[in-house]
């Protein structure tokens, strides 16, 4: 196995690095496939963004949640270590995971001594079929904000000449509450809200109009 890849890893399935800086060191997680054909997330470190050294395998699938793990992201939030990834070939599991390509959030503890994630919570990031490859960034005021691809390898309908077609989700602020990942639209969207209309006890029937609810954009 080439230097830098975890022993026994696939030479083809190694992609999607996510890089961040802590102090004078840079870190990167990447999607990888292990010897048993399932996903794993190796962690690397560098001082110059050119020479990278393998630190650990943060977590690995062991054929439990899909196969290849793509587009990983790793960060600490509200006292928890959080790993986001997009597994291929997921199997449906109750109402939490749908079959095919999906998303996965793993939370727990992780020491910066060994950089191994000890799981406490596993959940889907989004229950929609057209949601994939979420990535996060930190805003200047310290918020963890996530954006994802609003489409799926399983369901995209772009014409052959328009493979670039697609769109991204509304940015979401992340937080951890009671051991689960919470998401809310970024607060900057509030300034675009207009008049608020409240309707209560409306029976669900055929096509109907609600007083005060009109316009091209309704949230």
Can you say where each PLM-predicted feature lies in the sequence?
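Residues that flank catalytic or metal-binding motifs in active/ligand-binding sites
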Residues: 15, 39-42, 54, 70, ...
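Structural motif
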Residues: 36-42, 91-107, 157, 170
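Beta-rich accessory regions
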Residues: 104-130, 135-219
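Conserved Ser/Thr-centered positions that define the repeating blades of beta-propeller domains
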Residues: 43-49, 109
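Active-site-proximal structural scaffolding
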Residues: 12, 36-39, 65-67, 97-101, ...
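A short local loop/turn or secondary-structure capping micro-motif enriched for an aromatic residue
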Residues: 36-38, 62-64, 91-93, 126, ...
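Hydrophobic core segments of beta-strands in well-ordered, beta-rich domains
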Residues: 1-36, 41-44, 54-57, 71-75, ...
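Surface loop/turn signatures of beta-propeller and other carbohydrate-active proteins
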Residues: 1-21, 52-73, 113-134, 190-191, ...
